[in-house]
Amino acid sequence: MFSHVICKFLLTLSFITIIYAAKSESTINKPEKCGLKASSSSTVRIHYRSRVWGQEEYFESTYIREAPLEVKLGNGNLLKGIEDGIHGMCTGEIRRLLIPPNQAYGAIGIPNLVPPNTAIVVDVEMVNVNSPFSLWFWISGLILFSAFLLFGRKPIKGDTSNIKKKE
């Protein structure tokens, strides 16, 4: 019985290790002050360059086009590995992501660029983060709430406590 429990524990532990080893990221540059962080509902502008694992030549780069990519997270417009890897990034932060095949181009790959079932390395620079719940969101909500309290209060029908009686 005890050996059965240990066996299950070790099997579970090895499974968890395999899952967490599937994707790797490292921060190359992180700003001292981090304002907004990318979240699942953010619209971000990123520069990135991608290469096949084990090769030095990049097959895709927004730096060549000199225009960062603007994308709303959570819509499935990015590779899953990139989208997962940029969560929590600050403006100005640069990360290197090692993305496994199942979160990149999978069993198909990209003909003449990425072989099937191959990991890719993506360097991502966060140019801008625009979150719907930024500071301006909360300030505007506070202003609207204050305006409601000041101007929007009407007496409830039957409540005559604040109306002066005519004599």
From Swiss-Prot:
Catalytic activity: [protein]-peptidylproline (omega=180) = [protein]-peptidylproline (omega=0)
Any single Gene Ontology cellular-component annotation: membrane
Domain PPIase FKBP-type: 41-130
Keywords: Isomerase, Membrane, Rotamase, Signal, Transmembrane, Transmembrane helix
Membrane topology field: Single-pass membrane protein
Predominant cellular place of this UniProt entry's protein: membrane
InterPro entries, A to Z: FKBP2/11, PPIase_dom_sf, PPIase_FKBP_dom
Inhibition and activation profile: Inhibited by both FK506 and rapamycin.
E.C. number(s) listed in UniProt: 5.2.1.8
Gene3D superfamilies: 3.10.50.40
Any GO BP annotation: chaperone-mediated protein folding
Residue stretches spanning the membrane: 132-152
Source taxon at top rank: Eukaryota
Signal sequence segment: 1-21
Entry similarity comment: Belongs to the FKBP-type PPIase family. FKBP2 subfamily.
Protein name (record): FK506-binding protein 2A
Native source species: Rhizopus delemar (strain RA 99-880 / ATCC MYA-4621 / FGSC 9543 / NRRL 43880)
